[in-house]
């Protein structure tokens, strides 16, 4: 969670709904992008009345707390880069804290900016992995993104057209078939077992959702992976396109997502060079333009607002982001490393999980 979300309506609604849930053994909130102790205190205050099954309070991890930062520095000194501050690292820290406390077998993750949140969403997300009779290790959520218009631009106009165009250029590749099988591959909502949490490496940036799916593909059997509809419709904080600045907004998000897809495909033997990138981008643009025409028809049929020009601008921005991600890969195939999985961290630093738990708790005490 970002501190700015404490001021919005979404998080308060989520807390109210979660306070009525009676099956949670643990609630962990990972706060990133907040260096001030008073901001950390404000986030904790939102959860002050929440109680888990055994009466324990919610845990808020202050990612910028001095002791947590010292531990991250210790990882860097060991050659284990935890990445920069962001959604991926915040999620990774929360997973580490859950492993350290040894209370959970299944962990559900979702964002803190969901508008109109209902506790049924969490129940549906947890059930496939929590029910031992179902034998699933990983569940991915999906939902509709419609109000008076179609939302989910990155999924509609980038992710799905890119996967389809890559299949047309490269032919059937198991990883592409797998990624395309998800109804909403960029959904932030998923649940998984702690065994997978130990094994998965994840990106520190906006490539988190794609990176997690790729790691689950690598570390789990397909028959133990499922997807579940969480709600009929879903709304959250909308980001600006930022067409002229790849460092912000959806533009940056698409650069990170494209980088994650390219690097994961390369790890399965796909070669990326300048000529292939040009072909891939051309195929993507054509497929995305066809998608715009289809969405225009959907909007007309259902009486929705549809700005075709803004959709075309989005595709142009996303194609620029794809080119940037591809050229970055050609220049530096390794790129920014993924955060090491928890199995490797524990192997290198056997006491790290206990130290993380202690750091989280002491940072919270000192900030009080």
Across the structure, where does each feature detected by a protein language model lie?
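Short, acidic, metal-binding catalytic loop of nucleotide-sugar glycosyltransferases
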Residues: 13-25, 34, 49, 130
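Active-site-proximal specificity loops/subdomain of glycosyltransferases
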Residues: 38-102
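Short beta-strand-to-loop acidic/aromatic patch adjacent to the donor-nucleotide binding site
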Residues: 101-117
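Conserved donor-nucleotide/metal-binding helix-loop-beta segment in metal-dependent transferases, i.e.
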Residues: 115-144
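A recurrent flexible, glycine/aromatic-enriched loop bordering the glycosyltransferase active site
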Residues: 146-153, 170-189
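Catalytic donor-sugar/metal-binding loop of nucleotide-sugar-dependent glycosyltransferases
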Residues: 204, 214-233
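Active-site donor/metal-binding and catalytic loop motifs
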Residues: 226-247
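Terminal low-complexity segments of carbohydrate-biosynthetic enzymes
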Residues: 240-368
């Amino acid at each position: 969670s970002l501190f700015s979300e404490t001021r919005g309506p979404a998080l308060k609604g989520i807390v109210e709904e979660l306070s009525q849930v009676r099956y949670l053994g643990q609630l962990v909130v990972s706060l990133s992008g907040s260096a001030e102790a008073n901001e950390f205190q404000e986030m904790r205050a939102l959860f002050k009345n929440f109680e888990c099954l055994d009466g324990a309070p919610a845990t808020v991890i202050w990612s910028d707390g001095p002791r947590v930062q010292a531990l991250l520095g210790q990882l860097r000194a060991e050659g284990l880069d935890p990445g920069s501050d962001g959604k991926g690292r915040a999620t990774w820290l929360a997973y580490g804290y859950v492993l350290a406390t040894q209370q959970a077998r299944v962990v559900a993750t979702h964002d803190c900016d969901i508008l109109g949140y209902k506790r049924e969403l969490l129940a549906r997300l947890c059930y496939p992995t929590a029910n031992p009779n179902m034998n699933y290790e990983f569940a991915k959520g999906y939902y509709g993104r419609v109000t008076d218009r179609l939302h989910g631009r990155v999924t509609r106009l980038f992710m799905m057209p890119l996967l389809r165009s890559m299949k047309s250029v490269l032919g059937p590749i198991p990883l592409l078939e797998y990624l395309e099988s998800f109804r909403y591959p960029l959904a932030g909502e998923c649940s998984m077992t702690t065994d997978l949490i130990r094994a998965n490496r994840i990106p520190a940036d906006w490539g988190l959702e794609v990176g997690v799916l790729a790691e689950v593909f690598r570390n789990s059997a397909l028959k133990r992976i499922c997807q579940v509809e969480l709600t009929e419709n879903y709304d959250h904080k909308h980001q600006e396109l930022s067409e002229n600045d790849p460092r912000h907004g959806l533009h940056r998000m698409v650069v990170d997502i494209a980088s994650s897809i390219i690097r994961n495909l390369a790890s399965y033997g796909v070669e990326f060079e300048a000529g292939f990138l040009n072909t891939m981008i051309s195929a993507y643009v054509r497929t995305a333009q066809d998608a715009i025409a289809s969405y225009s028809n959907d909007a007309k049929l259902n009486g929705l607002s549809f700005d075709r020009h803004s959709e075309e601008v989005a595709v142009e921005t996303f194609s620029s982001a794809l080119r940037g991600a591809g050229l970055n890969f050609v220049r530096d195939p390794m790129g920014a490393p993924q955060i090491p999985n928890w199995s490797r961290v524990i192997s290198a630093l056997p006491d790290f999980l206990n130290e993380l738990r202690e750091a989280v708790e002491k940072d919270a005490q000192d900030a009080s």
